[in-house]
Regions:
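Compositionally biased, low-complexity flexible segments
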Residues: 298-330
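Conserved C-terminal helix/tail region of periplasmic/extracytoplasmic solute-binding proteins
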Residues: 257-311
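A ligand-binding cleft/hinge motif common to bilobed small-molecule-binding domains
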Residues: 40-53, 101-104, 140-159, 168, ...
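Pocket-lining segment of extracytoplasmic ligand-binding domains
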Residues: 119, 129-221
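Extracytoplasmic/secreted envelope proteins and their assembly/folding machinery
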Residues: 3, 28, 32, 43-46, ...
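Short, solvent-exposed loop/beta-turn-alpha elements that line the ligand-binding surface or hinge
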Residues: 4-13, 166-171, 239-248
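Short, glycine-/small- and polar/acidic-enriched structural segments
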Residues: 1-124, 140-143
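Secondary-structure end/capping motifs
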Residues: 186-266
């Protein structure tokens, strides 16, 4: 956004209005209300928004990041059984990492209720509060996204008990994707394709010069929070993520199944959540093949293979969702 890539892709006469929001849930609410037209959100907010609207409100049109989440714990916890009686944090009840933790605990035969009871007490809270609580010894660990996982290790003295990448086929699982309002996609397909083109251009920029991309990310973090990440934190987190237009649809279905299994989501059919037609058209024009296993509305193959995956970080204390509105000026 800040370097003008998206504005250039949209072209003259289009008023791009970016918004930073506090969470994926807030972004979906803004999408519902018409306050924004598109947003970068995690998988579970997209699933929840799709389910709440009866499959009518939104479509996933591209992936953005894959990977980058872990369960980091204090010394003395080296196996699942060591977690009995501990307190673990997640970013929010029902969010992507919260579902991942509760699902993994259930798979280990460890009970954790949504009220904070059970064998392990799960405490949903802001990531910044989690870091402070971990350093102070008020919690025993947390399942969090990057760069918070790396910060818990480097600043909190923790170690990784579970790297979420080890739980997914090929180590690939969606962490951020581009969603648009279904009505906006229907009414303005050319503008949505331009947004996708801007995303692909951004991916190319990151892939071509990761060092410059890291510096740009840190500049953005400093502009929002007033403080830069340490170079070691940024590098450690960067190595855990992949910036890719592939929405990794199999992992979205897996996240849904996990949420249903632990009673955080009613069963929902996600077969219509993807519309990757415009992404595939843009990739084709760039000489890149489609792929990834999702299906478009007409039954065509969806998703997209990354043009050479490179790691990317999600900003530090930056809000966890970003929305935008694109309108013709005048």
């Amino acid at each position: 956004m800040e370097d003008g890539t998206f504005a250039d892709a949209l072209g003259a006469g289009i008023d791009l209005q970016p918004h930073t929001l506090n969470s994926g849930t807030e972004a979906i609410e803004a999408l519902f209300s018409g306050a924004i037209d598109a947003a970068f959100v995690g998988p579970n907010p997209a699933i929840n928004g799709f389910a709440q609207s009866g499959g009518e409100a939104l479509r996933i049109v591209a992936g953005t990041t894959s990977g980058g989440a872990a369960l980091v714990v204090r010394d003395g916890i080296d196996a699942p059984d060591d977690l009995i009686g501990t307190t673990l944090a997640t970013p929010a009840l029902g969010n992507t990492q919260d579902v991942a933790l509760r699902s993994w605990l259930a798979g280990q035969g460890i009970d954790a209720t949504t009220e904070g009871g059970g064998d392990v007490s799960v405490r949903p809270q802001e990531n910044a509060d989690t870091l402070t609580a971990f350093v102070d010894g008020a919690i025993d660990g947390a399942w969090v996204p990057e760069p918070w996982a790396t910060r818990l290790v480097l600043e909190g003295g923790g170690h990784v008990l579970v790297d979420e990448a080890t739980l997914w086929e090929g180590g690939r699982f969606v962490t951020t994707q581009l969603v648009v309002a279904a009505s906006y996609l229907e009414d303005h397909p050319a503008l949505v394709r331009a947004l996708i083109a801007g995303l692909l251009d951004s991916i190319d920029t990151v892939n071509a010069d990761p060092a410059a991309a890291q510096a740009a990310v840190n500049d953005g973090i400093e502009a929002i929070t007033g403080k830069r990440l340490a170079d070691a934190t940024l590098a450690g987190a960067w190595a855990k993520l992949t910036f890719t237009p592939d929405p990794v649809p199999g992992s979205l279905e897996g996240s849904k199944e996990h949420a249903v299994a632990i009673d955080l989501l009613e069963p929902v059919d996600l077969s219509a959540i993807y519309d990757l037609t415009l992404l595939n058209q843009e990739l084709s024009d760039r000489g890149q093949p489609p792929g990834g296993g999702a299906r478009g509305p007409a039954g065509g193959r969806g998703a997209a293979n990354p043009p050479r995956p490179q790691p990317v970080i999600r900003p530090g204390r930056r809000p966890s969702a970003c929305g935008s509105r694109a309108r013709r000026a005048g």
